[in-house]
Amino acid sequence: MSICMHVTGKGDERVDYIPGISSIRLVDLPSSIVLRNHKILHRILEAFSWVTKTQYLLFNSIYELESQAIDVLKAELPMSIYTIGPTIPYFNLGENSSIISNHNDLNYLEWLDCQPRNSVLYISMGSFLSVSNAQMDEIAIGLRDSEVRFMWVARDETCRLKEVCGNMGLVVPWCDQLKVLSHSSIGGFWTHCGWSSTQEGMLCSVPLLTFPIAVDQMQNSKLIVEDWKIGWRVKQDVRGESLVTREEIARLIHKFMNLESDDVKETRRRANELQQICQRAIAKKGSSETNINAFIKDLSKCDGR
């Protein structure tokens, strides 16, 4: 908890002395604001209480992507540590992944089938945290003004956002996100940077627009933009109260979805590289499969004793 920061006026300052973590802005570190939420604080303290009883620590991550941090943890912590990610439902993605397995998938997958390749921006900001209504309106109007095709998972605000966003895309209450991200028409992913969404975007080789809200999402955004270089930030001051305006959003989306842009081409190239790293990790004899087998072997030894 000592790394939680109060960063008013100093958010762009950087620190480079945290073991295993490359230079990072203060604003991207965990905030003390998180600890004011009693439910979150209880979960954090509960997790800390388990450390002394723990024999194994499994990370839903890929060693090659966070090797420096993992190596530091292995050196500092007494338990065995294994990276076994990405732990998502299925790995063989491709054109067959758009096959409909649920009647509720029909409308949005049929719509995606009719869109040009890499032309649709997929938007999802998670279900746990939310942005203000004012910011949501700015995003919707900016999206409309960008004239970019989109698919937005908005849950409780579907009807209202449909009216604001115009007719360039779909607003739906739910979707099978992995199916959508692996669809050939998807060219970008506006994400809150939850860890599962981040991994799914990487595995599907989709460039990311990062819009973190709280908890670990700022650090995930930093990894996406600065370390892995597979995405762009929507909001520079992630803890500031000022809105990202509709004009800023429209310009950014239009630029991000321009497949002829050199910056976009480079981001897409990096996304392809990260996808290959993910695929190698979960392939036979890859790092994640090797770690899973090693963990099972260790458990078997314990049972034998």
Question: What are these language model-derived features?
Answer:
Residues 197, 208-210, 214-215:
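Short glycine/proline-centered loop/turn elements that form peptide/ligand docking sites
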Residues 1-179, 188, 204, 213-215, ...:
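Nucleotide-sugar-dependent glycosyltransferase catalytic domains
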Residues 169-170, 184-197, 206:
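Acidic donor-binding loop of glycosyltransferase active sites
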